């Protein structure tokens, strides 16, 4: 059984194509079941976001399975395969596992280190589970992908540096004030950037939020979202002395705040620090206010500089994250080889025990003069010889999962002793279960 990934992303396809290929059906479970009904596909899961559309599948026929999935993706969205094919990437086996782990860890995201993709991947897996299209392969791989992503976030700094303008502004505010709890905020403007900044700020347990905009209704709408208070645009300078943090982003086309105004306001505040964030272009705040003591002004270029520095830090962290991914892949394959070792050991022991028992019975049949005690001694002797002979090779096989040569040892034992553990019957369920696990995941 092989693990496959087929899809496209912001790296390979324009947004127009990503929109057309997006799986946003009213019946996502039905789409998943249609995928697993394709020839050679036994399991299926879809990850569909604004930046990527990927199908994860298990298949006993990788080439045929990929061809079926490619055809399905085109036909389901009313496209010719020729339109789709140049934008697709296809991975199988170890490469597919690496891709999944990198996606889960946000190493393949448009914004390196962003946290949303892991949640989206978990939702996709939950849907596959509830639709009964996740089986042994996905049920083992996805938890390992989540574990890899957790390690990356815990052991690297990949998510610790702001890489959006709105969050960079909050990060700078924290550097100025240390703790934003109880700090009052004024937002001048009601566009998307103001909304994002307000969302980040309100997550810091801030105090009062004042919102102003030329259109009062828009200011009221934004204020309601964050439990704030809207004030008329013409009156906002009167409230500035109450604000510890001021964020401006309007299309005013000129300065809303001058140095003279801020000098008066900082006196009213008795020189308590003010943090001003001007993300408007053209700028809303006179850059000269930076010369006022206890006034800290940052414009869009300052924030972009912070973002670029932080991106460099995330790229450094990504190198360590890639090492973690490789460690997790090795760990997964080590576990996979250990699954094969268990039924192989049982099969080898059974075969040798069958030979020992048969030959011992033959010998004892020709030694009728031996009493019961002598016969037990012969049985014990033959068992001891078998155990001594098998001890060293079985110890090596038990460690097969910890050594890159484990696969070679297992294959050698299989061939030398003509073993086929997957087809052998046992008195218990555990060996059969292990054999099935190995068969499901071998790639």
From Swiss-Prot:
Catalytic reactions of this protein: (S)-4-amino-5-oxopentanoate + tRNA(Glu) + NADP(+) = L-glutamyl-tRNA(Glu) + NADPH + H(+)
Site for Important for activity, residues: 99
Species of origin: Syntrophotalea carbinolica (strain DSM 2380 / NBRC 103641 / GraBd1) (Pelobacter carbinolicus)
Region (Disordered): 421-443
The protein's name in its UniProt record: Glutamyl-tRNA reductase
GO molecular function: glutamyl-tRNA reductase activity; NADP binding
Residue numbers binding NADP(+): 189-194
Pfam families xref list: GlutR_dimer, GlutR_N, Shikimate_DH
Family: Belongs to the glutamyl-tRNA reductase family.
Role description: Catalyzes the NADPH-dependent reduction of glutamyl-tRNA(Glu) to glutamate 1-semialdehyde (GSA).
SUPFAM superfamilies linked: Glutamyl tRNA-reductase catalytic, N-terminal domain (SSF69742), Glutamyl tRNA-reductase dimerization domain (SSF69075), NAD(P)-binding Rossmann-fold domains (SSF51735)
PROSITE patterns in the cross-refs: GLUTR
Protein's GO biological process: protoporphyrinogen IX biosynthetic process from glutamate
Lineage of producing organism: Bacteria, Pseudomonadati, Thermodesulfobacteriota, Desulfuromonadia, Desulfuromonadales
Tagged with keyword Secreted: no
């Amino acid at each position: 059984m092989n693990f496959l990934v087929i899809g496209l992303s912001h790296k390979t396809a324009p947004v127009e194509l990503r929109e057309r290929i997006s799986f946003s059906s009213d019946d996502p479970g039905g789409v998943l079941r249609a995928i697993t009904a394709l020839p050679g596909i036994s399991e299926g899961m879809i990850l569909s976001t604004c930046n990527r559309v990927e199908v994860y599948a298990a298949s006993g026929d990788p080439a045929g399975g990929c061809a079926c999935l490619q055809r399905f993706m085109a036909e389901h969205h009313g496209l010719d395969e020729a339109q789709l094919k140049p934008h697709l990437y296809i991975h199988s086996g170890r490469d597919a596992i690496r891709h999944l782990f990198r996606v889960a860890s946000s190493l393949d995201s448009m914004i390196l280190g962003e946290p949303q993709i892991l949640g989206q991947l978990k939702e996709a897996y939950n849907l596959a589970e509830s639709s009964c299209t996740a089986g042994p392969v996905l049920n083992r791989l996805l938890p390992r992908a989540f574990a890899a992503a957790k390690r990356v976030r815990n052991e690297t700094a990949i998510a610790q540096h702001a890489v959006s303008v709105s969050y960079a502004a909050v990060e700078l505010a924290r550097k100025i004030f240390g703790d934003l709890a109880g700090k009052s905020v004024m937002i001048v403007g009601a566009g998307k950037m103001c909304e994002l900044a307000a969302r980040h700020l309100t997550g810091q347990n801030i105090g009062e939020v004042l919102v102003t905009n030329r259109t009062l209704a828009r200011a009221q709408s934004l204020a309601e979202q964050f439990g704030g208070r809207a004030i008329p645009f013409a009156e906002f300078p009167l409230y500035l002395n109450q604000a510890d943090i001021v964020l401006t982003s309007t299309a005013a086309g000129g300065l809303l705040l001058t140095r003279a105004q801020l000098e008066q306001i900082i006196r009213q505040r008795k020189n308590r620090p003010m943090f001003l964030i001007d993300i408007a272009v053209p700028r809303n705040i006179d850059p000269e206010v930076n010369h006022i003591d206890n006034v800290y002004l940052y414009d869009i270029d300052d924030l972009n500089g912070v973002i670029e520095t932080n991106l460099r830090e995330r790229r450094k962290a990504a190198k360590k994250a890639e090492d973690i991914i490789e460690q997790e892949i090795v760990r997964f394959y080590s576990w996979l080889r250990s699954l094969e070792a268990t039924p192989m050991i049982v099969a080898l022991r059974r075969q040798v025990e069958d030979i020992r028992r048969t030959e011992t019975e033959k010998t004892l049949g020709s030694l009728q003069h031996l009493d019961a005690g002598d016969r037990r001694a012969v049985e014990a002797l033959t068992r001891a010889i078998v155990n001594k002979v098998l001890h060293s090779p079985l110890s090596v096989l038990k460690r097969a999962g910890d050594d890159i040569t484990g696969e070679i040892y297992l294959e050698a034992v299989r061939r030398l002793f003509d073993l086929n553990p997957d087809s052998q019957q046992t008195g218990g369920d555990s060996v059969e279960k292990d054999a099935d696990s190995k068969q499901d995941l071998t790639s």
